[in-house]
Protein backbone atom coordinates (compact mmCIF):
# COMPACT_ATOMS: atom_id res chain seq x y z
CA UNK A 1 0.00 0.00 0.00
CA UNK A 2 1.32 3.37 -0.95
CA UNK A 3 1.49 6.08 1.70
CA UNK A 4 2.12 8.79 -0.84
CA UNK A 5 -0.15 11.77 -1.04
CA UNK A 6 0.77 12.29 -4.68
CA UNK A 7 -1.66 10.91 -7.22
CA UNK A 8 -1.47 9.81 -10.80
CA UNK A 9 -4.35 11.69 -12.43
CA UNK A 10 -4.77 9.04 -15.15
CA UNK A 11 -8.23 7.57 -15.37
CA UNK A 12 -6.64 4.12 -15.18
CA UNK A 13 -4.17 4.63 -12.35
CA UNK A 14 -3.77 1.85 -9.76
CA UNK A 15 -5.79 3.83 -7.25
CA UNK A 16 -8.63 4.48 -9.68
CA UNK A 17 -8.80 0.80 -10.63
CA UNK A 18 -9.01 -0.17 -6.95
CA UNK A 19 -11.81 2.35 -6.37
CA UNK A 20 -13.79 1.06 -9.35
CA UNK A 21 -13.38 -2.61 -8.32
CA UNK A 22 -14.34 -1.84 -4.71
CA UNK A 23 -17.35 0.15 -5.87
CA UNK A 24 -18.46 -2.64 -8.19
CA UNK A 25 -18.31 -5.30 -5.46
CA UNK A 26 -19.94 -3.07 -2.84
CA UNK A 27 -22.77 -2.05 -5.17
CA UNK A 28 -23.16 -5.67 -6.32
CA UNK A 29 -23.68 -6.66 -2.69
CA UNK A 30 -26.14 -3.81 -2.10
CA UNK A 31 -28.34 -4.77 -5.03
CA UNK A 32 -28.18 -8.52 -4.58
CA UNK A 33 -28.96 -8.08 -0.89
CA UNK A 34 -32.06 -6.01 -1.62
CA UNK A 35 -33.66 -8.69 -3.79
CA UNK A 36 -32.45 -11.54 -1.58
CA UNK A 37 -33.98 -9.85 1.47
CA UNK A 38 -37.21 -9.10 -0.40
CA UNK A 39 -37.39 -12.83 -1.22
CA UNK A 40 -36.84 -13.55 2.48
CA UNK A 41 -39.74 -11.25 3.40
CA UNK A 42 -41.98 -13.05 0.90
CA UNK A 43 -40.89 -16.45 2.23
CA UNK A 44 -41.68 -15.33 5.78
CA UNK A 45 -45.09 -13.91 4.73
CA UNK A 46 -44.50 -10.23 5.52
CA UNK A 47 -47.27 -7.97 4.06
CA UNK A 48 -46.64 -6.35 0.65
CA UNK A 49 -46.62 -2.82 2.06
CA UNK A 50 -43.63 -3.77 4.26
CA UNK A 51 -41.37 -4.18 1.21
CA UNK A 52 -40.64 -0.45 0.75
CA UNK A 53 -40.19 -0.18 4.54
CA UNK A 54 -37.04 -2.27 4.06
CA UNK A 55 -35.54 0.45 1.88
CA UNK A 56 -36.86 3.16 4.17
CA UNK A 57 -34.84 1.88 7.15
CA UNK A 58 -31.81 1.79 4.83
CA UNK A 59 -32.17 5.41 3.73
CA UNK A 60 -33.13 6.43 7.26
CA UNK A 61 -29.55 5.59 8.26
CA UNK A 62 -28.30 7.99 5.57
CA UNK A 63 -30.46 10.78 6.93
CA UNK A 64 -29.58 10.13 10.59
CA UNK A 65 -25.83 10.11 9.95
CA UNK A 66 -25.79 12.81 7.26
CA UNK A 67 -24.33 15.52 9.56
CA UNK A 68 -21.32 13.35 10.39
CA UNK A 69 -20.28 11.17 7.45
CA UNK A 70 -19.04 14.04 5.30
CA UNK A 71 -16.60 15.11 8.01
CA UNK A 72 -15.53 11.49 8.49
CA UNK A 73 -14.74 11.27 4.76
CA UNK A 74 -12.76 14.52 4.82
CA UNK A 75 -10.96 13.85 8.14
CA UNK A 76 -9.41 10.48 7.24
CA UNK A 77 -7.92 8.82 4.18
CA UNK A 78 -10.99 8.12 2.06
CA UNK A 79 -9.83 4.65 1.05
CA UNK A 80 -9.74 3.62 4.72
CA UNK A 81 -13.19 5.09 5.32
CA UNK A 82 -14.48 3.02 2.39
CA UNK A 83 -12.91 -0.12 3.86
CA UNK A 84 -14.52 0.45 7.28
CA UNK A 85 -17.90 1.13 5.66
CA UNK A 86 -17.76 -2.06 3.62
CA UNK A 87 -16.91 -3.92 6.82
CA UNK A 88 -20.18 -2.67 8.33
CA UNK A 89 -22.06 -3.84 5.25
CA UNK A 90 -20.43 -7.26 5.59
CA UNK A 91 -21.54 -7.44 9.23
CA UNK A 92 -25.13 -6.50 8.32
CA UNK A 93 -25.39 -9.07 5.52
CA UNK A 94 -23.90 -11.78 7.73
CA UNK A 95 -26.38 -10.99 10.50
CA UNK A 96 -29.32 -11.55 8.13
CA UNK A 97 -27.72 -14.85 7.07
CA UNK A 98 -27.66 -15.95 10.70
CA UNK A 99 -31.32 -15.18 11.34
CA UNK A 100 -31.23 -11.67 12.81
CA UNK A 101 -34.34 -9.61 12.01
CA UNK A 102 -33.90 -8.57 8.34
CA UNK A 103 -34.91 -4.98 9.02
CA UNK A 104 -32.20 -4.65 11.70
CA UNK A 105 -29.54 -6.26 9.52
CA UNK A 106 -30.49 -4.08 6.57
CA UNK A 107 -30.31 -0.98 8.78
CA UNK A 108 -26.68 -1.86 9.60
CA UNK A 109 -25.94 -2.16 5.88
CA UNK A 110 -27.52 1.29 5.51
CA UNK A 111 -25.16 2.73 8.14
CA UNK A 112 -22.21 1.33 6.18
CA UNK A 113 -23.59 2.72 2.94
CA UNK A 114 -24.06 6.14 4.53
CA UNK A 115 -20.39 6.23 5.57
CA UNK A 116 -19.25 4.85 2.21
CA UNK A 117 -20.92 7.27 -0.19
CA UNK A 118 -19.15 10.59 0.59
CA UNK A 119 -15.78 8.82 0.53
CA UNK A 120 -16.34 6.96 -2.76
CA UNK A 121 -17.32 10.10 -4.66
CA UNK A 122 -15.01 12.47 -2.80
CA UNK A 123 -11.96 10.35 -3.63
CA UNK A 124 -12.53 10.85 -7.37
CA UNK A 125 -11.51 14.50 -7.06
CA UNK A 126 -8.32 13.41 -5.29
CA UNK A 127 -7.36 10.75 -7.84
CA UNK A 128 -8.13 12.80 -10.95
CA UNK A 129 -8.77 16.44 -11.74
CA UNK A 130 -10.24 18.93 -14.17
CA UNK A 131 -11.78 17.71 -17.40
CA UNK A 132 -11.23 14.08 -16.37
CA UNK A 133 -13.61 14.40 -13.41
CA UNK A 134 -16.76 14.02 -15.52
CA UNK A 135 -15.19 10.97 -17.20
CA UNK A 136 -14.23 9.57 -13.78
CA UNK A 137 -17.84 10.01 -12.68
CA UNK A 138 -18.88 8.20 -15.85
CA UNK A 139 -16.60 5.29 -14.91
CA UNK A 140 -17.97 5.25 -11.37
CA UNK A 141 -21.57 5.28 -12.60
CA UNK A 142 -20.83 2.63 -15.23
CA UNK A 143 -19.25 0.42 -12.56
CA UNK A 144 -22.20 1.02 -10.26
CA UNK A 145 -24.76 0.24 -12.92
CA UNK A 146 -22.92 -2.88 -14.04
CA UNK A 147 -23.07 -3.97 -10.39
CA UNK A 148 -26.77 -3.12 -10.23
CA UNK A 149 -27.29 -5.16 -13.38
CA UNK A 150 -25.44 -8.25 -12.20
CA UNK A 151 -26.24 -7.90 -8.50
CA UNK A 152 -29.98 -7.49 -9.00
CA UNK A 153 -30.17 -10.50 -11.32
CA UNK A 154 -27.94 -12.61 -9.06
CA UNK A 155 -30.03 -11.73 -6.01
CA UNK A 156 -33.29 -12.73 -7.69
CA UNK A 157 -32.01 -15.85 -9.44
CA UNK A 158 -30.16 -17.18 -6.38
CA UNK A 159 -33.16 -16.41 -4.17
CA UNK A 160 -35.37 -18.52 -6.45
CA UNK A 161 -32.88 -21.34 -5.87
CA UNK A 162 -32.25 -20.80 -2.13
CA UNK A 163 -32.55 -17.57 -0.12
CA UNK A 164 -29.64 -18.41 2.19
CA UNK A 165 -27.30 -18.92 -0.79
CA UNK A 166 -28.29 -15.49 -2.12
CA UNK A 167 -27.61 -13.85 1.25
CA UNK A 168 -24.23 -15.60 1.55
CA UNK A 169 -23.24 -14.35 -1.92
CA UNK A 170 -23.94 -10.79 -0.76
CA UNK A 171 -21.67 -11.20 2.26
CA UNK A 172 -18.94 -12.59 0.00
CA UNK A 173 -19.20 -9.55 -2.31
CA UNK A 174 -18.80 -7.17 0.63
CA UNK A 175 -15.76 -9.14 1.79
CA UNK A 176 -14.22 -8.72 -1.67
CA UNK A 177 -14.87 -4.97 -1.52
CA UNK A 178 -13.00 -4.75 1.79
CA UNK A 179 -10.00 -6.45 0.18
CA UNK A 180 -10.12 -4.13 -2.87
CA UNK A 181 -10.14 -1.09 -0.57
CA UNK A 182 -6.75 -2.15 0.79
CA UNK A 183 -5.20 -1.36 -2.60
CA UNK A 184 -6.41 2.25 -2.72
CA UNK A 185 -3.42 4.57 -2.04
CA UNK A 186 -3.54 6.16 1.40
CA UNK A 187 -4.03 9.82 0.52
CA UNK A 188 -3.77 12.70 2.95
CA UNK A 189 -7.01 13.67 4.68
CA UNK A 190 -8.71 16.56 2.87
CA UNK A 191 -9.64 18.49 6.05
CA UNK A 192 -7.91 17.02 9.11
CA UNK A 193 -8.14 18.39 12.63
CA UNK A 194 -11.82 19.32 12.65
CA UNK A 195 -13.82 19.28 15.89
CA UNK A 196 -15.63 16.03 16.77
CA UNK A 197 -18.18 17.70 19.04
CA UNK A 198 -21.53 16.38 17.79
CA UNK A 199 -23.29 19.71 18.22
CA UNK A 200 -20.61 21.59 16.32
CA UNK A 201 -20.54 18.87 13.64
CA UNK A 202 -24.29 19.20 13.19
CA UNK A 203 -23.94 22.97 13.03
CA UNK A 204 -21.12 22.64 10.48
CA UNK A 205 -23.23 20.28 8.38
CA UNK A 206 -26.16 22.69 8.45
CA UNK A 207 -23.78 25.46 7.38
CA UNK A 208 -22.66 23.28 4.47
CA UNK A 209 -26.31 22.68 3.56
CA UNK A 210 -26.97 26.42 3.65
CA UNK A 211 -23.87 27.22 1.59
CA UNK A 212 -24.75 24.72 -1.13
CA UNK A 213 -28.41 25.74 -1.16
CA UNK A 214 -27.56 29.43 -1.59
CA UNK A 215 -25.46 28.66 -4.69
CA UNK A 216 -27.74 28.39 -7.71
CA UNK A 217 -25.71 25.70 -9.47
CA UNK A 218 -25.36 23.39 -6.49
CA UNK A 219 -29.01 23.90 -5.50
CA UNK A 220 -30.04 22.91 -9.03
CA UNK A 221 -27.84 19.81 -8.85
CA UNK A 222 -29.13 18.82 -5.40
CA UNK A 223 -32.78 19.04 -6.41
CA UNK A 224 -32.22 17.22 -9.71
CA UNK A 225 -30.29 14.28 -8.28
CA UNK A 226 -32.68 13.99 -5.32
CA UNK A 227 -35.69 13.73 -7.60
CA UNK A 228 -33.93 11.19 -9.82
CA UNK A 229 -32.77 8.78 -7.12
CA UNK A 230 -36.00 9.08 -5.15
CA UNK A 231 -37.89 8.11 -8.29
CA UNK A 232 -35.40 5.38 -9.22
CA UNK A 233 -35.70 3.56 -5.91
CA UNK A 234 -39.49 3.83 -5.96
CA UNK A 235 -39.55 2.37 -9.48
CA UNK A 236 -37.66 -0.69 -8.22
CA UNK A 237 -40.37 -1.50 -5.71
CA UNK A 238 -43.10 -0.62 -8.17
CA UNK A 239 -41.73 -3.31 -10.50
CA UNK A 240 -41.93 -5.98 -7.78
CA UNK A 241 -45.71 -5.51 -7.57
CA UNK A 242 -46.27 -4.51 -11.23
CA UNK A 243 -44.82 -7.71 -12.75
CA UNK A 244 -47.40 -10.17 -11.35
CA UNK A 245 -50.29 -7.77 -12.06
CA UNK A 246 -49.36 -6.63 -15.59
CA UNK A 247 -47.43 -9.67 -16.83
CA UNK A 248 -48.85 -12.49 -14.70
CA UNK A 249 -45.35 -13.64 -13.62
CA UNK A 250 -44.81 -14.44 -9.94
CA UNK A 251 -41.13 -15.44 -9.60
CA UNK A 252 -38.35 -13.42 -7.92
CA UNK A 253 -36.15 -13.25 -11.02
CA UNK A 254 -38.32 -11.34 -13.52
CA UNK A 255 -38.38 -8.02 -11.60
CA UNK A 256 -34.58 -8.25 -11.37
CA UNK A 257 -34.30 -8.78 -15.14
CA UNK A 258 -36.43 -5.70 -15.70
CA UNK A 259 -34.28 -3.71 -13.27
CA UNK A 260 -31.27 -4.94 -15.23
CA UNK A 261 -32.64 -3.27 -18.36
CA UNK A 262 -32.64 0.05 -16.52
CA UNK A 263 -29.06 -0.61 -15.44
CA UNK A 264 -27.88 -1.35 -18.99
CA UNK A 265 -29.52 1.82 -20.19
CA UNK A 266 -27.87 3.94 -17.50
CA UNK A 267 -24.43 2.67 -18.57
CA UNK A 268 -25.18 3.85 -22.12
CA UNK A 269 -26.60 7.16 -20.95
CA UNK A 270 -23.67 7.81 -18.59
CA UNK A 271 -21.22 7.19 -21.44
CA UNK A 272 -23.11 9.56 -23.71
CA UNK A 273 -23.17 12.25 -21.02
CA UNK A 274 -19.39 11.97 -20.52
CA UNK A 275 -18.91 12.69 -24.24
CA UNK A 276 -21.64 15.24 -24.88
CA UNK A 277 -22.03 17.24 -21.65
CA UNK A 278 -19.50 19.40 -19.80
CA UNK A 279 -19.77 21.41 -16.59
CA UNK A 280 -20.57 24.44 -18.76
CA UNK A 281 -23.41 22.72 -20.64
CA UNK A 282 -25.17 20.84 -17.84
CA UNK A 283 -28.61 22.10 -18.89
CA UNK A 284 -28.42 19.75 -21.91
CA UNK A 285 -29.41 16.91 -19.57
CA UNK A 286 -32.80 18.38 -18.60
CA UNK A 287 -34.95 17.17 -21.53
CA UNK A 288 -33.82 13.63 -20.71
CA UNK A 289 -35.10 14.07 -17.16
CA UNK A 290 -38.55 15.13 -18.37
CA UNK A 291 -38.72 12.19 -20.78
CA UNK A 292 -38.02 9.75 -17.92
CA UNK A 293 -41.42 10.55 -16.42
CA UNK A 294 -43.18 10.32 -19.79
CA UNK A 295 -41.68 6.89 -20.52
CA UNK A 296 -42.53 5.61 -17.01
CA UNK A 297 -46.15 6.57 -17.67
CA UNK A 298 -46.16 4.68 -21.00
CA UNK A 299 -44.40 1.71 -19.40
CA UNK A 300 -47.05 1.38 -16.68
CA UNK A 301 -49.66 0.61 -19.35
CA UNK A 302 -47.78 -2.32 -20.90
CA UNK A 303 -48.86 -5.96 -20.67
CA UNK A 304 -46.14 -7.63 -22.76
CA UNK A 305 -42.61 -8.47 -21.65
CA UNK A 306 -40.61 -7.30 -24.70
CA UNK A 307 -42.02 -3.72 -24.79
CA UNK A 308 -41.46 -3.55 -21.03
CA UNK A 309 -37.79 -4.46 -21.50
CA UNK A 310 -37.33 -1.86 -24.24
CA UNK A 311 -39.03 0.95 -22.33
CA UNK A 312 -37.07 0.27 -19.14
CA UNK A 313 -33.81 0.33 -21.09
CA UNK A 314 -34.85 3.69 -22.54
CA UNK A 315 -35.62 4.96 -19.03
CA UNK A 316 -32.09 3.93 -18.05
CA UNK A 317 -30.47 5.72 -21.01
CA UNK A 318 -32.35 8.89 -20.17
CA UNK A 319 -31.49 8.52 -16.48
CA UNK A 320 -27.76 8.09 -17.05
CA UNK A 321 -27.65 11.09 -19.36
CA UNK A 322 -29.56 13.13 -16.77
CA UNK A 323 -27.79 12.34 -13.51
CA UNK A 324 -24.06 12.08 -14.37
CA UNK A 325 -23.58 15.77 -15.29
CA UNK A 326 -25.49 16.85 -12.18
CA UNK A 327 -23.23 14.71 -9.97
CA UNK A 328 -20.09 16.15 -11.56
CA UNK A 329 -21.37 19.72 -11.18
CA UNK A 330 -22.02 19.26 -7.46
CA UNK A 331 -18.63 17.65 -6.82
CA UNK A 332 -16.71 20.36 -8.66
CA UNK A 333 -18.54 23.32 -7.09
CA UNK A 334 -18.87 21.65 -3.70
CA UNK A 335 -15.18 20.78 -3.46
CA UNK A 336 -14.32 24.47 -3.73
CA UNK A 337 -16.85 25.65 -1.15
CA UNK A 338 -17.50 23.06 1.58
CA UNK A 339 -15.26 20.11 0.64
CA UNK A 340 -16.13 17.15 -1.54
CA UNK A 341 -17.04 14.91 1.40
CA UNK A 342 -19.45 17.44 2.89
CA UNK A 343 -20.95 18.17 -0.54
CA UNK A 344 -21.70 14.50 -1.13
CA UNK A 345 -23.07 14.13 2.42
CA UNK A 346 -25.48 17.01 1.76
CA UNK A 347 -26.40 15.39 -1.55
CA UNK A 348 -27.06 12.11 0.25
CA UNK A 349 -29.36 13.90 2.69
CA UNK A 350 -31.36 15.36 -0.18
CA UNK A 351 -31.50 12.14 -2.19
CA UNK A 352 -32.41 9.95 0.75
CA UNK A 353 -34.99 12.40 2.05
CA UNK A 354 -36.59 12.22 -1.41
CA UNK A 355 -36.40 8.41 -1.32
CA UNK A 356 -37.96 8.30 2.15
CA UNK A 357 -40.78 10.61 1.09
CA UNK A 358 -41.50 8.83 -2.21
CA UNK A 359 -41.27 5.34 -0.69
CA UNK A 360 -43.52 6.42 2.17
CA UNK A 361 -46.15 7.72 -0.25
CA UNK A 362 -45.82 4.54 -2.36
CA UNK A 363 -46.14 2.27 0.69
CA UNK A 364 -49.20 4.22 1.84
CA UNK A 365 -50.76 3.94 -1.63
CA UNK A 366 -50.25 0.17 -1.61
CA UNK A 367 -51.55 -0.11 1.96
CA UNK A 368 -54.84 1.67 1.13
CA UNK A 369 -55.36 -0.54 -1.93
CA UNK A 370 -54.62 1.69 -4.94
CA UNK A 371 -53.85 -0.60 -7.93
CA UNK A 372 -50.23 -0.64 -9.03
CA UNK A 373 -50.89 0.49 -12.64
CA UNK A 374 -52.56 3.80 -11.62
CA UNK A 375 -49.74 4.30 -9.12
CA UNK A 376 -47.22 3.97 -11.97
CA UNK A 377 -49.13 6.38 -14.21
CA UNK A 378 -49.35 9.03 -11.50
CA UNK A 379 -45.72 8.50 -10.55
CA UNK A 380 -44.48 9.08 -14.12
CA UNK A 381 -46.65 12.15 -14.66
CA UNK A 382 -45.59 13.80 -11.39
CA UNK A 383 -41.90 13.15 -12.10
CA UNK A 384 -42.12 14.73 -15.57
CA UNK A 385 -43.86 17.79 -14.11
CA UNK A 386 -41.28 18.11 -11.31
CA UNK A 387 -38.31 18.06 -13.71
CA UNK A 388 -40.08 20.53 -16.01
CA UNK A 389 -40.56 22.89 -13.07
CA UNK A 390 -36.89 22.50 -12.10
CA UNK A 391 -35.75 23.31 -15.66
CA UNK A 392 -37.96 26.41 -15.83
CA UNK A 393 -36.59 27.55 -12.47
CA UNK A 394 -32.99 26.92 -13.59
CA UNK A 395 -33.43 28.93 -16.81
CA UNK A 396 -34.93 31.86 -14.91
CA UNK A 397 -32.14 31.94 -12.34
UniProtKB/Swiss-Prot annotation:
Residues 39-52, 112-144, 188-226, 278-280, 326-343, 388-397 are cytoplasmic. SUPFAM superfamilies: MFS general substrate transporter (SSF103473). Residues 1-17, 74-90, 166, 248-256, 302-304, 365-366 are periplasmic. The keyword Zinc-finger does not apply. GO terms for molecular function: lysophospholipid:sodium symporter activity. NCBIfam families: PRK11195.1. HAMAP family: MFS_LplT (MF_01585). This is Lysophospholipid transporter LplT. It is a multi-pass membrane protein. The gene is lplT. InterPro entries: LysoPLipid__transptr_LplT, MFS, MFS_trans_sf. It holds the Pfam family MFS_1.
